[in-house]
From Swiss-Prot:
Coiled coil: none annotated. Homodimer. Possesses an unusual extended V-shaped dimeric structure with each monomer consisting of three distinct domains arranged along a curved 'spinal' alpha-helix. The N-terminal catalytic domain specifically recognizes the glutamate moiety of the substrate. The second domain is the NADPH-binding domain, and the third C-terminal domain is responsible for dimerization. One of its GO terms (molecular function) is NADP binding. This is Glutamyl-tRNA reductase. The record marks 97 as: Important for activity. NCBIfam families: hemA. InterPro entries: 4pyrrol_synth_GluRdtase, 4pyrrol_synth_GluRdtase_dimer, 4pyrrol_synth_GluRdtase_N, GluRdtase_CS, GluRdtase_N_sf, NAD(P)-bd_dom_sf, Shikm_DH/Glu-tRNA_Rdtase. Belongs to the glutamyl-tRNA reductase family. During catalysis, the active site Cys acts as a nucleophile attacking the alpha-carbonyl group of tRNA-bound glutamate with the formation of a thioester intermediate between enzyme and glutamate, and the concomitant release of tRNA(Glu). The thioester intermediate is finally reduced by direct hydride transfer from NADPH, to form the product GSA. Pfam families: GlutR_dimer, GlutR_N, Shikimate_DH.
Length: 406
């Protein structure tokens, strides 16, 4: 049976954060969903980031609707509610999508480095869940290798391209004077650390940094001019800060309406970099406070010239074609194995007939051999003759190959 590779994706290009956050879930739950879906298809991988939730799978037929049903169930939505936000691809287009994602070409900030780690973790999680097979393993491994090479060739490996840098740049634009501002950062994951690094280049008046697990804060280089504070302090500091960046893994808002309405002094700007959102959307209605979500940030403020004139897309396309050729060769190899098994079974049956007849009448052994040989030839060539009218060139090639040893 021919396998079809498919992907369904809800991304920053297709859906707002209000939809994407419904499809965001912690690693433990991702593994559970993989194992649940893995009972239905031979191979499946789930990729979840703040910008996208994507399901890649292998099936015996083109069944993109199955992936939409999976995502709808995951997000507690109906298929009708979700399908307008879903990107669906299969075959070569699904492969091309995977390579573009890993290369950072489909990212909100083109070339951002986080996507490589996220794609790698998705592959490794599927392997741990027992849902990664040879086709998707090769797809993700090749796309990761291509993504790493693209970053080097395009000069993106310097680490200067990230959503955190965009967020700090946008905060500086909205505040007009970030250097005199007091800034609070909640979260010490990859995004939170990137925010701290970007802030240190701007030199605000004060930078407070806190995290629920203090151990992660201890990893910050000592030269960074940041005041590390206890997690219990942030509700007080949120009203003393001019700008607040929130980037935690909390599954629901942690900065709520009561945190900003109890006090006379309010922060001017709240930047929510989390999905699901960590800032209560109701705070947007409080006069004097501006809430910026991940969708409000500029898509990619870095000009195309930052690519240093490197033709990135053709390089990715060549990698896509290499994978597709491997996939085709693997498919043909499977067909050859199936044909071999069929022919072997047929030959064994004919030989059994020959042996039975030869034992009954040894004098007719030669005649029996000729009859059996003719029967085997007819059965071998019959499928080719049947396809002669629709695919004469392929049949001619097959016949030439069968006669190759003459």
């Amino acid at each position: 049976m021919t396998m079809t590779l498919s992907v369904v994706a809800v991304t920053h290009r297709t859906a707002p954060v209000t939809i994407r956050e419904r499809l965001s879930l912690p690693v433990e739950q991702q593994c559970q969903w993989l194992q649940r879906w893995g009972n239905q298809v031979p191979e499946i991988v789930l990729l979840v980031t703040c910008h996208r939730t994507e399901v890649y799978w292998l099936d015996g037929e083109e069944t993109a609707h199955r992936g939409v049903e999976w995502l709808a169930e995951l997000g507690g939505l109906t298929v009708e509610e979700l399908e307008r936000w879903v990107l669906q691809r299969s075959g070569a287009e699904a492969v091309r999508h995977a390579f573009c994602v890993a290369a950072g070409l489909d990212s909100r900030v083109v070339g951002e480095p986080q996507i490589l780690g996220q794609v790698r973790r998705a592959r490794d999680l599927a392997r741990a869940a027992g849902t990664l097979g040879p086709i998707l393993d090769r797809l993700f491994s090749c796309s990761l290798a291509t993504g790493r090479m693209v970053r080097v060739r395009a000069g993106w490996s310097t680490g200067k391209r990230s959503l955190a840098r965009v967020a700090v740049r946008e905060a500086a634009r909205l505040c007009s004077d970030l250097q005199s501002a007091r800034v609070l950062v909640l979260g010490a994951g990859e995004t939170g650390r990137d925010v701290i690094a970007a802030l240190c280049r701007c030199q605000p008046a004060v930078v407070w940094w806190t995290n629920r697990s203090p151990g992660r804060l201890a990893q910050i280089p000592s030269e960074e001019p940041v005041r590390i504070v206890d997690w219990s302090e942030w509700p007080r500091l949120v009203t003393e800060a001019d700008v607040v960046f929130v980037a935690t893994n909390a599954p629901e808002p942690i900065v709520r309406l009561e945190h900003v309405t109890r006090h006379a002094r309010l922060p001017r700007l709240l930047v929510d970099l989390a999905v699901p959102r960590n800032v209560d959307p109701a705070i947007s209605d409080v006069p004097g406070i501006r809430v910026v979500t991940i969708d409000d940030l500029p898509a990619d403020p870095v000009p195309v010239a930052a690519w240093d004139g490197v033709a990135v897309e053709p390089y990715v396309e060549r990698a896509v074609q290499r994978y597709l050729r491997w996939l085709e060769a693997r498919s043909i190899a499977a067909e050859i194995r199936a044909a071999h098994e069929t022919l072997q079974s047929m030959l064994e049956r004919e030989l059994e007939k020959v042996l039975r007849l030869a034992l009954r009448d040894p004098a007719r052994t030669g005649e029996v051999k000729r009859v059996a040989a003719a029967s085997m030839a007819r059965k071998t060539l019959f499928p080719l003759f049947r396809a002669l009218e629709s695919e004469p060139q392929r049949v001619a090639l097959a016949l030439r190959l069968l006669a190759y040893d003459r």
